[in-house]
């Protein structure tokens, strides 16, 4: 079914001359595209391992209430009955997806990848004897498929006998069989490929077309066997009620802790020796408590990308990483350069790096070649055996030995960001006006506009683990699953510029001349904090800096003692935590963001004297400096949304680790360097591993509950912002997030109900 459209173009130079264009529009293609777009809305994007981002497993159902979405998806139900034909279809689909989406793990590359998944399948399927079983009619049918995936979808729906009114539902069911692979393809088409450029283009239409073709061949009666699945609503409703009970208990406990602290919020403190700005990550909270107890230090909370939407090219790396939230698109390209302290050291580093790259290329070529792997094993076997023995029996020693050898070959050097706008290559760097604008916005958002300390440390965070496909899940989510130290160093460098400070002073932010900014990084696995070299001066306030480094080591020890209680270790705290960061057999190097429960937007004075047990995201905020609510608007629509993604991923990975988690790490296989499978052919697992949320097989460590957001600000400001943004109305009124306002004047707690009314919490 098609239509003709005639377009007439008038020549502006001569109105009597017209050019006529005839276009043929295939209505079926448009209808199928519309259906695919509709069913795609309920698929959650799945990020690759290298930038593993937390996301709500039921993101596509947020238009429903939380309870309706959970019941509809039957989170707690048993698996569907085994269907051999369905499993065969899945197996073939996994084979094609794995081959097409592979990013360097496979020895041979799938032909025609640059033309798309469907095109490649179209050309290769007639040669797949496992699919057509050398049946002549099937092989002929595969050889004469239409060129467009939408046309193939229509052909298959008709061949399978799916009624028109049931086609969209059937497509939803088709996608639901492998939501992990479908979610990864959705990420490629909607998140990775925002600028329209992709080497190997793929879409959910491609995925559905290939899947339906395989279904026609292997499971032609699929539409007749698609039955309404029996729902265990009683079990699910009881599960939801248990979650609600935990939420009520935790909310009351937290509010009781906060109540005595409300009178302390307006107390102004004297100038601190040092201020440390940490990421809002829940793992920062216990460390902040530890360092605040050791001296005249003040800590603040801010999103760990420090307000800078940048892409960063590492000094030693060839890849460029987007170091900002996935909700944002990087605006600036930054690279690093070595600090020219020792030219001989830099030269040694460059030669060593080249030597290591050559060795790595040779090793990779030998390892993935058809004929050389056995020879490689024979020649390197004894050395690999020794390495395996050391890494297994003494991981700390093995790590230290590896580090020393690397230092001998390629000594580490200090680097600094290069961020000044390149007049010859304007795509690199940040203009002065934008440096000033982003620096001002960052300071205002973190509530640091006066009373600056002598030292201000912006502290990003990352983790250190071995043999861990989910390493990026432990790094900074606000930096797109990367480590945040470079963003911290970049903001510090900008704020150390005199011209930037003068411009900020004109806008009401007066930074004292004796204030120095430093970048740093907090290792959340070991609690080590590295303060980066400053290019301004290494002698000003050296006594304060030395004392701070000493106190940071003490804080590390104290926080290790607190954390070890949750890790069920009988060893010395620091020794065991150091081992976890270096042991390649360790399935739980740290707990990550497990037990996260609340997002608190308030001055630090409100929470400073409370042990929040590492369960709260803490964002600094002073409502008295934000009369129009613009800063709060940014906080609620960006970092709070990211916190909700994290919270729901942990929630669903806990209550159903099979459906929404990724199962045990013990049986993980990395697939194509993009994700993990259970065994050698499964769906692409898209949640957190069992070891990230469960202390034992049958006992959860994470407490599944929805995010509780507490905002220290007048209700009228909050209400205006909620009414202004659909995302906030969706999250609050559909009860994906609970919102409590703390009135700064009356000190009363108010809960926002799903009816858009406020009720006092007694």
Swiss-Prot record:
GO molecular-function terms, A-Z: zinc ion binding
* Main localization category: membrane
The record lists Zn(2+) as bound by 279, 281, 461, 476
Does the record's keyword annotation contain Membrane?
yes
Residue intervals passing through the bilayer: none
Q: How does it sit in the bilayer?
A: Peripheral membrane protein
Quote the subcellular location field of this record: Cell inner membrane
Q: Which InterPro entries match?
A: DabA (IPR018752)
Q: Which domain of life is it from?
A: Bacteria
Pfam families, from UniProt?
DabA (PF10070)
Q: Which keywords label this protein?
A: Cell inner membrane, Cell membrane, Membrane, Metal-binding, Transport, Zinc
Write out the GO cellular component annotations. Answer: plasma membrane
- Cofactor(s) this protein cannot do without: Zn(2+)
What does the subunit comment say?
Forms a complex with DabB.
Per the entry, what this protein does is: Part of an energy-coupled inorganic carbon pump.
Q: Which family does it belong to?
A: Belongs to the inorganic carbon transporter (TC 9.A.2) DabA family.
Record's protein name: Probable inorganic carbon transporter subunit DabA
In the UniProt record, what gene is named as encoding this protein?
A: dabA
């Amino acid at each position: 079914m098609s239509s003709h459209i005639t377009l007439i173009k008038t020549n502006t130079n001569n109105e009597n001359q017209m050019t006529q264009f005839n276009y043929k529009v295939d209505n079926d293609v448009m209808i199928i595209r519309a259906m695919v777009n509709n069913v795609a809305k309920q698929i959650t994007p799945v990020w690759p391992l290298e930038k593993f981002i937390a996301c709500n497993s039921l993101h596509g159902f947020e238009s429903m209430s939380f309870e309706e979405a959970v019941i509809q998806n039957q989170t707690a139900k048993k698996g569907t009955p085994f269907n051999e034909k369905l499993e065969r279809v899945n197996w073939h689909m996994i084979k094609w997806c794995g081959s097409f989406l592979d990013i360097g793990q496979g020895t041979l590359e799938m032909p025609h990848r640059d033309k798309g998944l469907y095109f490649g399948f179209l050309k290769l399927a007639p040669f797949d004897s496992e699919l057509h079983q050398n049946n002549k009619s099937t092989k002929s049918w595969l050889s004469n498929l239409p060129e467009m995936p939408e046309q193939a979808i229509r052909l298959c729906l008709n061949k399978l006998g799916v009624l028109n009114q049931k086609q969209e539902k059937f497509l939803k069911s088709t996608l639901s069989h492998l939501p992990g692979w479908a979610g990864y393809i959705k990420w490629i088409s909607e998140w990775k490929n925002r600028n329209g450029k992709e080497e190997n283009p793929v879409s959910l239409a491609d995925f559905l077309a290939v899947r339906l073709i395989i279904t026609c061949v292997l499971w032609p009666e699929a539409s007749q066997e698609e039955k309404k699945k029996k729902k265990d609503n009683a079990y699910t409703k009881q599960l939801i009620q248990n979650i609600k009970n935990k939420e009520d208990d935790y909310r009351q406990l937290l509010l009781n802790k906060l109540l005595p602290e409300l009178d302390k919020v307006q107390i102004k403190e004297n100038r601190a020796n040092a201020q440390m700005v940490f990421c809002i990550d829940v793992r920062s909270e216990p460390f902040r408590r530890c360092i605040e107890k050791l001296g005249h230090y003040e800590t603040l909370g801010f999103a760990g990308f420090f307000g800078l939407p940048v892409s960063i090219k590492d000094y030693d790396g060839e890849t460029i990483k987007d170091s900002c939230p996935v909700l944002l698109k990087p605006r600036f390209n930054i690279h690093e350069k070595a600090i020219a302290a020792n030219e001989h050291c830099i030269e040694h580093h460059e030669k060593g790096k080249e030597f290591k790259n050559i060795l790595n290329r040779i090793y990779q070529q030998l390892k993935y070649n058809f004929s050389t792997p056995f020879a490689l094993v024979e020649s390197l076997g004894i050395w690999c055996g020794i390495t395996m023995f050391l890494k297994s029996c003494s991981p700390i020693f093995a790590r230290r030995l590896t580090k020393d050898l690397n230092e001998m070959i390629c000594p580490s050097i200090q680097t600094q960001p290069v961020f000044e706008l390149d007049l010859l290559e304007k795509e690199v760097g940040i203009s002065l006006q934008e440096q000033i604008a982003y620096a001002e916005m960052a300071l205002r958002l973190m509530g640091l506009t006066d009373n600056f300390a002598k030292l201000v440390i912006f502290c990003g965070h990352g983790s250190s683990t071995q043999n861990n496909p989910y390493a990026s899940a432990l790094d900074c989510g606000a930096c797109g699953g990367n480590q945040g130290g470079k963003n911290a160093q970049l903001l510090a460098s900008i704020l150390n510029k005199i011209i930037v400070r003068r411009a900020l002073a004109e806008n009401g932010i007066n930074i004292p001349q004796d204030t120095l900014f430093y970048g740093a990084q907090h290792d959340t696995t070991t609690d080590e904090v590295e303060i980066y070299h400053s290019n301004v001066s290494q002698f000003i306030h050296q006594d304060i800096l030395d004392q701070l480094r000493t106190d940071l080591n003490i804080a590390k020890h104290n926080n290790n003692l607190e954390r070890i209680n949750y890790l069920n270790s009988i060893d010395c705290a620091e020794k065991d935590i150091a081992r976890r960061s270096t042991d390649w057999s360790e399935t739980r190097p740290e707990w990550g963001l497990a037990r996260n429960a609340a997002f608190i937007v308030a001055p630090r004075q409100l929470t400073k004297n409370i042990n929040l047990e590492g369960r709260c995201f803490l964002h600094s905020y002073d409502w008295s400096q934000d009369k129009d609510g613009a800063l709060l608007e940014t906080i609620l629509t960006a970092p709070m949304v990211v916190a909700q993604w994290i919270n729901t991923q942990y929630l669903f990975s806990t209550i159903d680790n099979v459906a929404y988690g990724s199962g045990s790490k013990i049986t993980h296989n990395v697939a194509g360097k993009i994700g993990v499978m259970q065994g050698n052919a499964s769906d692409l697992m898209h949640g957190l591993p069992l070891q990230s949320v469960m202390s034992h097989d049958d006992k959860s460590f994470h407490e599944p509950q929805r995010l509780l957001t507490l905002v220290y600000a007048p209700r009228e400001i909050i209400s205006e912002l909620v009414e202004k943004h659909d995302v906030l109305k969706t999250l609050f009124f559909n009860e994906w997030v609970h919102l409590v306002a703390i009135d700064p004047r009356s000190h009363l707690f108010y809960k926002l109900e799903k009816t858009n009314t406020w009720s006092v919490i007694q």
